[in-house]
Amino acid sequence: MIQMQTNLDVADNSGARRVMCIKVLGGSKRRYATVGDVIVVSIKEAIPRGKVKKGDVMKAVVVRVRKDIRRPDGSVIRFDRNAAVLINNQSEPVGTRIFGPVPRELRAKNHMKIISLAPEVL
């Protein structure tokens, strides 16, 4: 469950290391985001010579959350850290690689490019 002021790791090679959620997109009263949701983030920590720099405001897709994700078959999946992948205005990933596993719930939200770049889909 991601809300405003939540810090997330960045799971791609865009150059950002840590971001902070500043808005959950999808309705004026929407409070929480989960896997597959698009949020607006501010870059809080970045590496030198990356594609993004500290202070940039971008969109991101949440790919891992610590909160339990319940599946229709009754199973539950949860991750150790909250993580997101930066995207541009055309909903394409800014980076060219994705690090770590991503859940298959991203497929239902039409983030196929992220699924195809990920090394493991749970």
Swiss-Prot record:
Entry keyword annotation includes RNA-binding: yes
Gene Ontology biological process terms from the UniProt entry: translation
Domain of life (superkingdom): Bacteria
SMART domains reported for this sequence: Ribosomal_L14 (SM01374)
UniProt KW keywords: Ribonucleoprotein, Ribosomal protein, RNA-binding, rRNA-binding
GO MF term (any one): large ribosomal subunit rRNA binding
GO cellular component: cytosolic large ribosomal subunit
Repeat found in the keyword field: no
NCBIfam families named in the record: rplN_bact
Subunit structure: Part of the 50S ribosomal subunit. Forms a cluster with proteins L3 and L19. In the 70S ribosome, L14 and L19 interact and together make contacts with the 16S rRNA in bridges B5 and B8.
Function text: Binds to 23S rRNA. Forms part of two intersubunit bridges in the 70S ribosome.
Family statement: Belongs to the universal ribosomal protein uL14 family.
Protein name as it appears in the record: Large ribosomal subunit protein uL14
UniProt source species: Rhodopseudomonas palustris (strain HaA2)
Lineage: Bacteria, Pseudomonadati, Pseudomonadota, Alphaproteobacteria, Hyphomicrobiales
Gene this protein is translated from: rplN
